[in-house]
Amino acid sequence: MENIPIEDQKWRRGQITFNRHFAASIKKMREMALSNKDYDPARLFKWGQMMSLALIRALKAVEKNLGAPGQKVINQVLIELGREIGQEVLRDFVRLPQTKDIEVVSKFVTYINEEIWASPEIPLIINDQECLCDVLWCPHQDHYQAFDCRVQRYIVQGLLEAFQEKTGIAVDAQFTQIIPKGAKTCQFHMRLISPQEEREWNKYSAQLAAKALEKLKEKSQNE
């Protein structure tokens, strides 16, 4: 198969154009690391996996030692990170006039999966209000327990907030199945909502946060 050069500045699919995040540092990485024939790209995975494990372990330690206030600080940091990345990706966002809102949503989700989570996916537009995708492989699937995946939800929350602010399109999200629970894919369902509607995504994240603290409370009582 012919290797097609990747444009590090822009990401284009059909009628949609986004910026690629971290473009300047990616250029440097290609020049100083990937251009070296002795450099194994799998090293990036191992480094990134270490950092992802550090994040979930840091969250658990903060929850154990500082409780709800500490948990809230970590979660807010992740939301803000998601917003920053989303704003960078959407800064020069372009859509052709005939593009439907759900097409924009579907392409943004593809960018999230492929470029932010490094995950191959199969997208599907169901109708003018809904779309979904099947994530075929997740970098965390062999290292995170199912409950650990909650840490990523706050980054997604920030991404969705940035998306609504830039495009005016309000969207909610739901995972219907995940690989760490034994499913073949992680399935991600998206639907358009009114701008005033609270996201079920955020509500469920709050439930998981409360559950994490409750687990710690039960564990301490049983020790």
Predicted regions and their residues:
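Phosphate-moiety recognition in structured ligand-binding domains
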Residues: 133
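N-terminal accessory segment detector
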Residues: 1-130, 139-155, 162-189, 193-223
